[in-house]
């Protein structure tokens, strides 16, 4: 499983390798092409996924090289893997962007197959380590956009911010940008009849967020 030999021997060329194996030094050569821009703009390197913490050792090695060159580092993660991964990452990551898809662990398990205990554990450990963290909550109609789900996530973020450097929570309203990926993979798109939130609905959400003494950023697409 995962050996990719099927792609090499596929008679009809129906399977293609999307991506390639690279070393840390090869990636650094690519990163350094934009070094002047990173330094002048304050930008940097963000590792995402899939789930980047499944390759923690490689990510740490790459980000350590970035730090040697004074390049800002960030990771996007669901924070569902072992806490030891995040203890390693905290040594080389300037900014964690961490998803909370549902604050209620029972609902989280019903929707995604696992609870959110690891997410909470890793967030709390990062707070203790002094890491800079932004929580991100994808908002999907009928799944996690109830009053209890939204306020629960915000209240949890506010409580964490008193424990460490949790900077804000980003709310990411559902959109259909991923539909083409499903088509390319010949998969059925699971949300067929929801075009996303209207501008008026987003305006009401922003007005609702103003009652909280905490930075909540609604990301409009």
Regions found by a protein language model. Give the residues of each.
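Iron-sulfur (Fe-S) cluster-binding segments and ferredoxin-like electron-carrier domains
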Residues: 13-19
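Active-site anion-handling motifs in enzyme catalytic cores
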Residues: 22
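A charged helix-plus-loop insertion that forms the helical arch/lid used to bind
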Residues: 185-195
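A cross-taxonomic marker for long C-terminal extensions/tails that follow the last structured domain
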Residues: 200-221
